[in-house]
Design a protein with these regions (language model features):
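Extended, solvent-exposed, turn-rich assembly/linker loops in the middle of proteins
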Residues: 149-226
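N-terminal alpha-helical "arm" segments
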Residues: 1-47, 365-370
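Residues forming anionic-ligand binding surfaces in small-molecule and nucleic-acid pockets
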Residues: 98-112
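Assembly/oligomerization interface modules of large self-assembling protein complexes
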Residues: 29-101
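Sequence/fold signature of self-assembling virion shell proteins
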Residues: 2-7, 205-370
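A general structural signal for short secondary-structure junctions and capping/turn motifs
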Residues: 53, 183-187, 298-300, 313
Length: 370
């Protein structure tokens, strides 16, 4: 005789917070930077352009611009006849890329499942939003990469190769302070934003250890900048940190949605709208509809009986364009973006602050320890 047949089974207690890290977002610093600059008072994208571009699906968006003129003549004599000095115009074409994500839900699937509808919906929404944001962040980094300056009026004592400042390990603690003079020499003296990765975050924290009351005050290296961090700025081999320095007010992002979303159409059980998704502070198009069909293969034995059931469809999409301030002659005219990368030091070797001996002549050969 035994009670084994009626022994309590495993206790299952729904607790959605336990798996929260399975859809955790990263930091999308490049995307956040473009969005912030779009909404700034000195944005390169006017409200009119944003509004017209948002409704431009099916059309090409072009912006009239005037090219740089480096041939202005300054005379040393007065004349009764003032010469012409005409500008040259061009059309800047906005380049769009389409992004689309979606998922489905079968409402009655949860009648015999420990996972609730809300738990499953929330995790699906979180993971598609995370993927959407990550793709946009990667595109923002690619835009910075493509827009980095080819011209440095004064590179100070850094090596400038392949349009990148190569920072030796010994100068890692100096580059943040030197970026401002380099930008100023390129005629960009404004506030600098830094879009960097974990290596740059580490560097800033090390500089912060040497503050106003420490041996050397390194606050001026970084305190006049705005930092944005993302894992999508990737180090090349033998590099320990990579960043883009960008003058304030020189980038932005445009979006547009499909025609039905723009019109908020409702037809044949389909619904379109314009929404803002978590992690992405941009307007995107949404599409929702339901259908009836065989759902028996959705969850194996748990859905084997579901041969005619309702299924919900959730879709989100947008065309996105990352915009850099126009430059019709990037070979001659500097762009407001500088890329720099810091050489890696050996593993388990700390980053040391340089020590300069100004009275070396007072010590005998062999140095101060002799």
């Amino acid at each position: 005789m035994s009670l084994i047949a009626t022994r309590l089974q495993n206790w299952r207690v729904e607790n959605p917070e336990l798996d929260r890290n399975m859809t955790r977002p990263c930091e999308y610093g490049a995307l956040d930077f473009f969005i912030e600059q779009t909404n700034a008072g000195n944005s390169i994208l006017s409200p009119k352009l944003r509004e017209r571009a948002f409704a431009s699906i099916g059309n090409t968006v072009q912006v009239p611009v005037i090219n740089y003129d480096g041939d202005v003549t300054v005379s040393n004599v007065r004349t009764c006849v003032i010469p012409d000095d005409e500008n040259t115009s061009a059309l800047y074409t906005v380049v769009w890329a389409t992004y689309s994500v979606g998922f489905t839900m079968v409402p009655t699937l949860y009648m015999n499942n420990e996972i609730s509808y809300d738990h499953d919906f929330n995790r699906k929404m979180e993971k598609v939003c995370r993927a959407f944001a990550n793709s946009l962040d990667q595109a923002a980094v690619a835009a910075l990469e493509a827009g980095k300056t080819k011209v440095l009026k004064d590179k100070l004592n850094y090596k400038f190769a392949a349009n990148v400042i190569e920072v030796p390990t010994q100068m890692a603690t100096e580059i943040m302070g030197d970026i401002n003079p380099i930008m100023r020499a390129n005629c960009y003296p404004g506030l600098v934003h830094v879009v960097g990765n974990a290596g740059i975050d580490s560097l800033i924290k090390k500089l912060a250890q040497h503050g106003i009351y420490n041996d050397v005050n390194k606050r001026m290296e970084y305190e006049n900048k705005v930092f944005h961090y993302t894992n999508n700025v990737v180090n090349e081999a033998s590099k320990n940190g990579t960043f883009f320095a960008v003058e304030d007010g020189n980038v932005g992002v445009l979006t547009r949605v499909d025609r039905e979303a723009l019109n908020r159409t409702r037809a044949n059980f389909h619904e379109w709208d314009v929404v803002r998704l978590p992690y992405i502070d941009l307007p995107v198009g949404s599409h929702y509809y339901t259908a009836v069909g065989d759902q028996s293969q959705t969850a194996g034995a748990a859905s084997a009986d579901m041969t005619c059931n309702v299924k919900e469809y959730f879709g989100f999409s947008a065309d996105v364009a990352f915009v850099i301030a126009y430059n019709g002659n990037p070979i001659t005219v500097a762009n407001p973006i500088i890329k720099a990368q810091i050489a890696a030091r050996a593993e388990n070797v700390p980053l040391g602050m340089p020590v300069y001996v100004t009275n070396a002549g007072e010590f005998p050969a062999g140095g101060a320890s002799a």
